[in-house]
Structures are given as structure tokens and as C-alpha cells.
Amino acid sequence: MKKLLFTFLVSTGTIFFSCQRTYTQSKDYKNASLTIEERVDALLPKMSLEEKVAQMRIFHANIGVEAEGNGNLKLSDKVIEKLKLGIAGIKNPGEHMDPVAAAKFNNDLQKYIIENNRWGIPALFVTESYNGVDAAGSTRFGRPLTSAASFNPQLVNRIWDVVGREARLRGMHMCHSPEADLVRDPRFGRMSEAFGEDTYLTTQMVVNAINGVQGNYDGLGNGTHIGAVAKHFAGYGQVLGGSNFAAIEISPRTLIDEIYPPFEAAVKEAKTLGIMASHGDINGVASHGNPELLTGVLRDQWGFKGYVVSDSNDIARLFYFMNVAESPEEAAQMGLEAGIDIDLYAEDSYAYLPEMVKKNPNLEKLIDRSVRRVLRTKFILGLFDNPYIDIEEVKKGVRANSSLTLAKESDLESIILLKNENKILPLNKNKTTKIALLGPLVKDDTKSMFETVASKHISFVAEKGFHLTDEKGGAPKLLERDENAISKMVNMAKNSDLSILFLGGDEFTSKEAFFNNALGDRATIEPVGAQDELIEKIKALGKPVIVVLKHRRTLAINTISEQADAILDTWDLSEFGDESTARIIFGEVSPSGKLPVTVPRSIGQIPFHYSMKEINYKKGYLFMEDGPLYPFGYGLSYSNFEYSDIKKSNSEMTKDSEIEVSVTIKNTGNVKAKEVVQMYIKDVKGSVIRPDKELKGFEKISLNPGESKKVSFKITPEMLKFTGLKMEKVLESGEYTVMIGTSSVDYKKTSFQLKK
């Protein structure tokens, strides 16, 4: 066997030198003056079948892409073997290194890859982004659900612009983000990775995230930004029971009207370079084996030209988990025929393709189709012409002062004021006050961050008290109630003028439930541990209690809502989160965030989102107050805003015309503040049962005390279309109600008639 292997290598070497001579004569695909398609056409026919299949696989750097003590590249035998034929990409190389070291490391890695495959094909280095580049030394922003609360798409664009720049500077080329999923079930552990429950809000945020990370597409070839991979197509956030990998049962109409639009906009408007398929199925059809979805909808209907990548091991799972393939080989064929171009991580899926082609030569046409998409991406990114990073640029560009300032700005626009009894907030920083910072979400630097904001008149004591879980990564367990910790915090509160409690959840109470030996979803949505008990005991002291919520999933905070004098919902902010929270608490900035989700009173209300069909709202439940605890779009301010004078440009609209609806907003308070003006539309009578209302526009404005501003929204026929009885998009005549206001339940309204 060893002798045969040696013979094969020798013969391969012979082919190598032969092809090198041909390449020296032509150098066609290296010619930067050719179009990208011409370069792909020149390169693809030169490649062997095995080399093509290598361009359809991504492996993780943790299988043996390392640095020695001196920083030099160290590759395992397994990795060396994989790279002989080239590779589509590598996930997270150098992720634990500082940016400069990572850039040097990735330059060395790319050089090795280029010099050790026949055609000098560079690799895609792939990262992710949930709160900045998923790597050491990067600027840490709030998570997507946090930034969605800003209702400021331009801010999201700027955040992701930094992500794109910082990622490219460390040698990355693609980002398996953003999530274009809707998240409507707070049991789901990955809730904070997406932009909320609403189709329109998510679409605006996704388009701006992609435009930002890709540098408005121009940054790809310029070498300043990276390609986006919108995920998870489609319906992933709708898993039954909020359980990762669970089945997805969703009507075709809901899929088309609510789930698809963020992905469609990612393709058509933002020109995302990549799409990642969903872990799950849609009504029994596995997404990774669904040509109607990945080819019919994505490519034939929307015109997507980029590549589709599997989620981790999901082609193989068609065989061993979903049981829709008879063998690993059949799973590979299903993925290929469906339109999966790159196999992520799996060792036993597309590796079968060369042998399968011997039995079914027609498969090579599909392989060529996928490889063409991968090569095109590499040419778009300029990797054949400029594959390396300028180290001097890294030193200047990562964690720039402007990026750190942006992280703080995004925090301030995203914090939501849920309650402010008797206007206890903002606190007077010039009044002598002793404040206790208490609770399981207090961090080591919380006290120091508050001290940087407060004046010398304010003194702080801080105590975490107890942890929520044992903080084990796979399946964390809740800790037993700690009476001593609770008593200590109550005594500290007793000896203070007021308490700020840091409650909610952390990364161990809401996270991705990886496939093996890991949990992250929940069956309940109340705050875990003794948090409710803590606030009740401190409230009983008769002193003011302010709650700062930190969390990654929506929580049913009934007790907290009842007991607290004020609540600031901060979700999961940037690395400067506690400093930003202090700035809000002491009135440097008025809070302007709005809820990107509906907050239920109980898990029994789920599914529960503001845009559900109107018939869902006709009845409540026994023994529980009806409606949400806090509605979508809700958020208070330190000021007050008066809405008046709602007007429309016309009472009638046709399929060929538009109308404009406006409202005047006045800041009637005494502080400068921002307000999110929201427009909802309701189809009063439809051929199918329609949503109660749908967000169709919003604008964030800033007003000085006493200042007024007129805000206008354009309503187009396209905004009113939906999937009708025949499963085709329709525009129906009739009455439409327009609601403009401060939340999904507080608004002024008018109406118009659509006439055919």
C-alpha cells in the first residue's frame, strides 16, 4: 500500500511540473486585466476533480493550524495533507492571537497554501461576528439584538463597517454573519444573535449590516472589508419548542411574507457574497437537501450569484441525524444537487464526491457549478492579486479610537427605559448619595465604570453575591440558593441610600445548544436563581430600587417589573456597557432604545409577537392579565413627546401611485432626547387573515426641549402586497389603517382606500 501511495505521489508530481510549464506560458487566470468570469473560465478547466472538490470544503483551524512559541506557522500532518490540493477555506485561523500577530500568522498560512497547491489558489479565512470580530483584540460591540433596539440602521451600518475593517486587517475574508432569522421564541438560546421578531426591522438591520461589513461591496476588491454570509436560510429561528435542531413547522404563506424578506433583501439590495443554509427542515424537508429552497427560491427567483455554505456538519447530518439519506454518499449528493457549494467542517461528506463521479459522471457538472462560485468569490475579494495583509495598517486600524467611541455610542442608543416610577431617573450626580451596586450580573469593573461617570458626591459599594450557574460550558447547572450572599446584599442595601440591581441572565443561561453534550435553550423564561427573591427583600427596605437588566433572551420579568422603581433594559452591551449604563442613569444622555421584541408575561403566551393575526388577540387566558408585559417598539425617555396633526397626502391610492403620511412630534419635556417614530399599517379586510399590524417604517429623530419636527413616511403599493389565496403576491383593494406613534400600541391613526 505504501508503495502504491509513493507511486501516486510521484505521478502527481509529474503532472504538477507539466502543468507548471503550461501555466508559465499562459498565466491567463492570473491576468488581472481579464474579467472575473474570464479568469474563472481560464482556471476551472485546469483543475483535477480532486482539486475542485477541495475548493468545496472548509475546515476549522483547531484541527491543527497553530503557531509555535516564536509565532512561526505549525501545521499538523492532517492539515498538511488537506492543503496539498488547496482548500476553499479555513475557519478562525489565529483567533486567539492579537491582531498584529494574527495578521502575520495568516500571511504565513496563506503563503503556505498558495505555494503548496498546483495553481496557487488562495484560501478564504472565515470568521463570525455577534459583537465584533470573533477573535482576540477586536472592538467589542453589543450583540445584534442589542443594536436592533437602537432602531438606527445607519448606526448598525457603522458598527459592521468596523467589523469588516478589523476582520480584513487580521487576514479574514468572509464572515458567517449576520443572522437574517426572525427570533420570536425566548426559549431559543441563540436569540441575541438576530435582530428581533419583526420582518421589516430585521430586513433594515440585515441590509445595513451587510453593506457595512462588505464596505458597500466596493470594500471587497479593495481589500478593506470582508464578505458577508447571511444565515440561516430559512426559518431557523422558528424551531419548535425553541429547541436548537428541532423541526420547523411553518406555513408557506408565513415563510414567503415574513421569513424570506430579510434574506431576499440581503441578496438583491446588499449583494451578500454568501448564504448559509439552516440546520433544520421546513415542514419535513431538510434545508440542506432542498433544491426548491436553495436553488429555486434563492437563485432562480432572487438571482443569487454567490456561494451557499452548509452549517456545521449538516450535509452529513442528512444521513446520521435527519435520516433522509441512506448513506453518507447519498447525503453528499443531496447537498450537491440542492445547491450547497461548500461543506463546512465535515470529514465525511463531499470527500466522497471524487469516487461518486466515477459511478455518475454527471455529478462533475454540479461540482463545476459550485467550484465556479467559490473561485468567483476569491476573485471578487482580490485574493489572487493581493492575498496578504499590510502589517503596518493593522497597528493603526484595529481598536481605533473612533471604533471604541462608536461602541459607546451604540450602547447609549440601544438602552431601553422600561419603567421610571415618579421619574426617579436620572439620578442627580451632584447630590450626596451612597449607592449599592448589587446582583449576579455585577462585573469586576462595574464599580470603577460607575465611578468614572459619577461625581465625588456619589459613593459606591458593589457585590455580586452569587453566580447563576456553575458556568460550565457544555450544560451549566443552576447553583443552590445562597442565603449568606442574599443577606450580605440586603445589608449593603440597608446601609445605602438606594440600590441598583444587576439582574437577568448571562452567556451561560442563553447560548447555542451545540449538537453534542451542550445545552443552551430553556423550558422556562423567568429569571433563574434567587433574583426575584433578592429584589423583593431589598424593596421591602423601603428604599429606591433601580434594576439594570442584562440578558441574551427575552425574560418574563413580572416580579422585577412590579418591585422596581425603574428598569433599564440593556440586553448585552459592548465592552463599555456598564459605563454607558451609568451615563444613562446619571442623565448625561436620555435613553432612546425601543424593544425589538414583545415581552410576554408567561411562557404560556408563546408564540406571541405583535404582528400575529388579529384573531390571536380576541381572547386572553384565565387568571392572567391579557396582553404583553411590554409591547414591541416600547421604550420610555427622560423627556415627553407629543404626537399630533397626522395627515395624508391623499385619501385614495392606486396600484400605480403612492401616498405620504406625516405626523408632528414635539419634545414637551425639558431635556434633549431622541425618539423612534414608528409607522404601522393594517389591512382592514383581506382575502386571507392578515396580521394585526405590520411595521412598515420608522425614523429616529433628535429634538431639543420645545422643538417640533414633522416626520413623513411614503407608502407604496409594494409595501401592501402579500401572498394571497393562490399563493401568489397580490395587491388588494380596500381600506388600510395607518398608525404612527411611539410603540406598537401607542399611536395616532388615519386611513386610506386602495382602488384598483
From Swiss-Prot:
GO cellular component, one term: cell outer membrane
Induction, per UniProt: By ulvan and rhamnose.
Membrane topology: Lipid-anchor
GO biological process: arabinan catabolic process; xylan catabolic process
EC supergroup of this enzyme: hydrolase
Keywords: Cell outer membrane, Glycosidase, Hydrolase, Lipoprotein, Membrane, Palmitate, Signal
Residue positions bearing lipid (S-diacylglycerol cysteine): 19
Lipid attachment site numbers (N-palmitoyl cysteine): 19
EC number(s) per entry: 3.2.1.-
PROSITE patterns to which the protein is assigned, alphabetical: PROKAR_LIPOPROTEIN (PS51257)
Superkingdom in the source lineage: Bacteria
UniProt key word NAD: no
Keyword Iron-sulfur: no
SUPFAM superfamilies: (Trans)glycosidases (SSF51445), Beta-D-glucan exohydrolase, C-terminal domain (SSF52279)
GO terms for MF: alpha-L-arabinofuranosidase activity; xylan 1,4-beta-xylosidase activity
Signal peptide feature range: 1-18
Subcellular location(s) of the protein: Cell outer membrane
InterPro entries tied to this protein: BXL, Fn3-like, Glyco_hydro_3_C, Glyco_hydro_3_C_sf, Glyco_hydro_3_N, Glyco_hydro_3_N_sf, Glycoside_hydrolase_SF, Ig-like_fold
Cited function: Glycoside hydrolase probably involved in ulvan degradation. Ulvan is the main polysaccharide component of the Ulvales (green seaweed) cell wall. It is composed of disaccharide building blocks comprising 3-sulfated rhamnose (Rha3S) linked to D-glucuronic acid (GlcA), L-iduronic acid (IduA), or D-xylose (Xyl).
Family affiliation: Belongs to the glycosyl hydrolase 3 family.
Protein name per the record: Putative beta-xylosidase
Organism in which the protein naturally occurs: Formosa agariphila (strain DSM 15362 / KCTC 12365 / LMG 23005 / KMM 3901 / M-2Alg 35-1)
Species classification: Bacteria, Pseudomonadati, Bacteroidota, Flavobacteriia, Flavobacteriales
